[in-house]
Amino acid sequence: ATVASVGLAATFAGNGMNAVDVTWASMGQTLVMGFIFDRMSTLLAPAFVAIGLLVVIYSFPYMSDKNKEHPDAPRRRFYVYFSTFIGAMAGLAYSSTIVGQLVFFEITGVCSWGLISYYMTPTAKKAGMKALIITHIGALGLYIGAAFLFAGTGTFALSAISQLDSGMKTVVLLLILFVLSIHSLLMPGGEA
């Protein structure tokens, strides 16, 4: 995945391509889910994937049977959650619709829960549940933003935000910012 992402980024940087839109799901004329490959998405997604690769490499000693604190921990579950999390982060970068971002955001929330509560200790379970609740609260911002975007433009395409009147555009962008700020609570230094 890292090689493919970097190769895609190099293709866009080297060939001067503007953007490629791929429709994945639509209802009539309404784009529900799609992907955009442009300079920004092909910069962000490879960064997410490359950092994920480094984290996986760094995690090998912790996930081995030589881990004295947790020698019996099921390692496959960690790698499934982590790989899915990285894939969802790439999906967030490539998504061309707010519905797609919502789907990938929800996937990252479930994976965060699985990774945080990985060792299944009472403290880990409590922290994992808190993370799941926080990400679902954040997702409400995307649900509301999607509704406003669709009501104002008839589409879920992120590019349609520019078609909204200035007041509605501000509301939708603030809702997206709300989602990002809620998700940052799960990062080191956050309160979660």
Language-model region placement:
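Membrane-interfacial loop-to-helix junctions in multi-pass inner-membrane proteins
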Residues: 1, 39, 66-84, 96-102, ...
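Central hydrophobic cores of alpha-helical transmembrane segments in multi-pass inner-membrane proteins
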Residues: 1-10, 47-63, 85-86, 108-118, ...
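Transmembrane helix-loop-helix hairpins at membrane boundaries of multipass inner-membrane proteins
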Residues: 1-80, 152-163
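Juxtamembrane/interfacial segments at transmembrane-helix boundaries in multi-pass membrane proteins
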Residues: 12-34, 100, 107, 139-192
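Juxtamembrane/interface motifs at transmembrane-helix termini
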Residues: 12-15, 63-67, 113, 121-124, ...
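Catalytic P-loop NTPase motifs of RecA-like helicase/translocase cores
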Residues: 43, 110-111, 140
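MFS-fold secondary transporters
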Residues: 91-93
